Every structure is written in structure tokens, then in C-alpha cells.
């Protein structure tokens, strides 16, 4: 168990409850409400070890590449898919997510596109819908 997983499980108690599903190697998109930067680490740490190696959280590049500790957690520990939130005419923000799915990895995504302190989710961005249509065999 990696130090980040051990620490997260000790501090937060990140253990999954599989309701209506069970752990499997099937490619999936896990999605959740996003209230804190810890959400990514907690969800990823709660997965069984064999699933963590091929499950990549989606994270905002501008936040996770700032500072050596964040960058190490994001890139070396979590193997995140970094998304540039700045709008660009020439770049499709979903392309790194598509690449991840084409490679056969599962993903953890927060479809609201940002953190929200309230427990009730806000409106989802269209990206998760587009990915579901483009990758119908992914659960």
C-alpha cells in the first residue's frame, strides 16, 4: 500500500461500498460531486489496488502542476489526466480524456467541472455525456 493510500485510509476511512456493482477490470468512468481537492485522492485510494493502477483521475492542470508536492502526487502517485481549463480555439479539453479511454484506462471525473461546497451537485458539463456517447462500451 502506498503512503498516500495508507494516510488517506487512516485519516478519512476511504473504503468502498460496492452497491449494485462489484470491483472488476472492466473499463469505467467513475463520477462524483466535487467539494474538495481531497475528493480525487479519497476516491482513488478507496479503489482496490489492482484497479488503481489503471484508473486515472481527471484534474485541473493549473492547480495540480503548481508546486513540487502537488505535482508529485498528481503525476507520480495518481497518474492524473491533466486538463487545461483555459479556453483555446485550437485545443479540445476532452482530447486528453479520450486518449485515456482509448488507452484502456478507467477514469475518475467530476462532471460539474469545478468544486462546489454544497452537498447538492450543480449542473453537469456536457463532457461526460459526450464521452459516454463516444465510448459506449465503457461503463
Feature annotation, model-predicted:
Residues 1-8:
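N-terminal nucleotide/polyanion-binding subdomain common to many enzyme families
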Residues 10-139:
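Soluble catalytic domains of membrane acyltransferases
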Amino acid at each position: 500500500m502506498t503512503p498516500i493510500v495508507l494516510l488517506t485510509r487512516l485519516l478519512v476511512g476511504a473504503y468502498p461500498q460496492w452497491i449494485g456493482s462489484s470491483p472488476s477490470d472492466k473499463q469505467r468512468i467513475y463520477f462524483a460531486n466535487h467539494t474538495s481537492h481531497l475528493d480525487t485522492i479519497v476516491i482513488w485510494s478507496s479503489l482496490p489496488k489492482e484497479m488503481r493502477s489503471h484508473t486515472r483521475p481527471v484534474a485541473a492542470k493549473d492547480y495540480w502542476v503548481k508546486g513540487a508536492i502537488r505535482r508529485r502526487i498528481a503525476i507520480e502517485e495518481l497518474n492524473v489526466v491533466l486538463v487545461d481549463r483555459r479556453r483555446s480555439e485550437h485545443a479540445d479539453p476532452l482530447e486528453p480524456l479520450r486518449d485515456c479511454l482509448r488507452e484502456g484506462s478507467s477514469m475518475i471525473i467530476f462532471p460539474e467541472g469545478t468544486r462546489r461546497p454544497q452537498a447538492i451537485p450543480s449542473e453537469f458539463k456536457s463532457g461526460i455525456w459526450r464521452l459516454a456517447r463516444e465510448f459506449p462500451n465503457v461503463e
